[in-house]
């Protein structure tokens, strides 16, 4: 995934990055890996980017039920994914859990965007990455009310 900076937050990039819709053409029918990972990168760098936060918040709120339903399904059972969903359910995602999620996605200094079965214990569903970023932002006093 290409690293973006706060100055890259044009309306076009906001719309692009906020697309969390399922993409059946991708392997395993995953949500868009690159978008979710870029969202996480940008939240790390630009937690107060208000227009970006507003757009992502809007998309997230529209998708909340759908995401929670997916989280209850047997196909959505990675432990780190559940951390994010539990945070959505009103429980707190600790900084240690956030750090664990971030570190598990670091591969050779970059960000993994592939579903690697050999790393299935540390793989985090791309939508969960976006949710973790949202939860972290919420804890930092931004994004969600």
Where are these regions (language model features)?
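An alpha-helical repeat/solenoid feature that recognizes helix-turn-helix modules
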Residues: 1-14, 25-49, 70-96, 116-142
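Buried hydrophobic core positions in alpha-solenoid tandem helical repeats
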Residues: 17-21, 59-68, 98-102
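Kelch-like beta-propeller repeat domains
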Residues: 23-24, 107
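Short helix-loop boundary/capping segments
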Residues: 51-61
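Conserved blade-ending motifs and adjacent loop-strand segments that build the rim/top face
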Residues: 102-121
């Amino acid at each position: 995934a290409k690293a973006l900076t706060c100055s890259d937050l044009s309306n076009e990039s906001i719309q692009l990055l906020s697309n969390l819709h399922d993409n059946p053409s991708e392997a395993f029918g995953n949500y868009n890996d690159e978008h979710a990972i870029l969202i996480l990168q940008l939240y790390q760098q630009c937690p107060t980017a208000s227009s970006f936060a507003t757009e992502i918040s809007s998309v997230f709120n529209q998708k909340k039920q759908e995401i929670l339903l997916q989280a209850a399904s047997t196909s959505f059972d990675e432990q780190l994914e559940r951390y994010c969903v539990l945070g959505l359910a009103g429980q707190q995602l600790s900084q240690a859990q956030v750090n664990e999620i971030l570190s598990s996605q670091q591969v050779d200094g970059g960000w993994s965007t592939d579903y690697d079965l050999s790393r299935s214990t540390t793989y985090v569903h791309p939508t969960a990455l976006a949710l973790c970023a949202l939860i972290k932002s919420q804890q930092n006093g931004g994004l969600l009310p």
